Amino acid sequence: MTTLSNLSVDLVGEIFSRVPLISLSEVRCTCTTWNTLSWNILSENYVFGKADTSKQFLGFVVMNSKVCSLRLDLQGIHNNDFVDPSLKEINIVDQYDISNIFHCDGLLLCVRWIQPRSKYHKFHRLDMYAFGYDKQQQEPDEETVTLSCIRDEQLAVLYQPYDLCLDLFMEI
């Protein structure tokens, strides 16, 4: 009996080529191999066959201090068809006043602005943030994230796309 993890790479690629990007989260949960292949498609634009995923966009925006996911299907844009964007508010951070967001390598970093402690604080337009993980751990935890910041802000790692697995708020 053939299992999902034993399917040929070409067949899995054909399946991915028919799955819209906005529905990929359900496919990623199928098995570890499919999860890995989906990351190749998303992060490296490695697409098997004639994939429709290369014509889709997923991003994040801040509107009225609310974090929203923006999904845009670009199929048909060359045929002058109307491209209907999908804008969905992420309600998990409603109680926070988000001022800025950053998206990198599957993590969404939300920054909440607070009043600087010093009246001489000059970094307003030069804000810099960084996040990553510690590779020297014996058993790396995918949900462990190290945050750093050059100013007095509250930072939050909200979640990995397609998987609400981490909800951590801390003051630096």
UniProtKB/Swiss-Prot annotation:
Domain F-box residue range list: 1-51
Domain of life: Eukaryota
Organism field: Arabidopsis thaliana (Mouse-ear cress)
Protein known as: Putative F-box protein At3g13825
InterPro entries in alphabetical order: F-box-like_dom_sf, F-box_dom
